[in-house]
């Protein structure tokens, strides 16, 4: 069986991180679809493990959180009639938390947009940030209980609630109604109204759509398995935090946040995959959990 060199792995991973679909990569590199897909899975696992172990004790004054929509296998309205729809088909949400100063993605979670995932996401965020900070979310009610459970009174939390105009119905329209204004809802602590914003996390949503082909609207490159969707997100977050230089900061977010003291290359992510392969596999019962 042929094995990809680290150079070939790095090339394929870079193409994935720059928004290219799996089939397009096979046409460019000559690697099989299964080879590219397996590398995505292996890289996603390695990147998720590295993030979990190393993005800890982050010093942050302000964090913004949001959820970005995509779908797996079929859109939610079509899942009931879709042929052989797998578990996890339909709406797929990615929860993200960004540090407003360093632009580091501190925490992320792939799953549903409900109270259970809100609790898991906010608890993970609490485990990664050191000290008290100001948190801003959108108006999703699930955040209120999740923040109370994770932080109690040790946080300054506000929600930026958007006010929308009337819904415009037109053939092929998929965007939401026009936002006509916002209002601040102070939930816990003493949040500074001047910094109640979700602008940075919403801008990072655009970066995700530009750098992951499966997030691009109106294409056939959407995820077919929710597990692979989560692996793609993990790879992107590693690339965004450690490899891609932020234009404004002139360093990577991980460097700006003090998580690392050097600029990573895409080859470093390929090395993470190689190191993970060298470790003996752990034996034990399979337990399906929430994808991080």
Regions found by a protein language model. Give the residues of each.
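Residue-level recognition of single "structural anchor" positions
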Residues: 1-292
């Amino acid at each position: 069986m042929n094995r990809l060199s680290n150079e070939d792995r790095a090339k394929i991973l870079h193409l994935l991180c720059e928004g290219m679909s799996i089939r397009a990569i096979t046409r460019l590199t000559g690697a099989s679809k299964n080879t590219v897909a397996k590398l995505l899975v292996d890289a996603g696992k390695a990147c998720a493990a590295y993030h979990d172990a190393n993005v800890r004790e982050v010093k942050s004054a302000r964090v913004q959180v949001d959820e970005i929509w995509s779908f797996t296998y079929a859109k939610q309205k079509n899942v009931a009639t879709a042929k052989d729809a797998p578990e996890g088909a339909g709406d797929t949400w990615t929860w993200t938390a960004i540090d407003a100063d360093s632009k580091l993605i501190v925490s992320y979670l792939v799953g549903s947009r409900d109270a259970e995932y809100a609790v898991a996401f906010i608890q993970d965020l609490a485990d990664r940030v050191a000290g008290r900070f100001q948190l801003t979310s959108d108006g999703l009610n699930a955040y209120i209980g999740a923040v109370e459970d994770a932080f109690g009174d040790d946080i300054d939390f506000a929600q930026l609630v958007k006010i929308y105009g009337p819904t415009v119905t037109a053939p092929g329209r998929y965007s939401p109604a026009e936002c006509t204004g916002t209002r601040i809802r102070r939930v816990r602590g003493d949040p500074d109204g001047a910094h109640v914003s979700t602008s940075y996390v919403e801008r990072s949503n655009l970066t995700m759509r530009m750098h992951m082909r499966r997030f691009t609207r109106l294409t056939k490159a959407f995820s077919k398995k929710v597990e692979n969707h989560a692996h793609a997100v993990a790879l992107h977050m590693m690339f965004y935090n450690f490899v891609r230089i932020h234009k404004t900061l002139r360093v990577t977010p991980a460097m700006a946040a003090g998580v690392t003291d050097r600029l990573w290359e895409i080859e470093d992510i390929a090395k993470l995959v190689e190191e993970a392969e060298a470790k003996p596999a752990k034996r034990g019962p399979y337990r399906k959990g929430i994808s991080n």
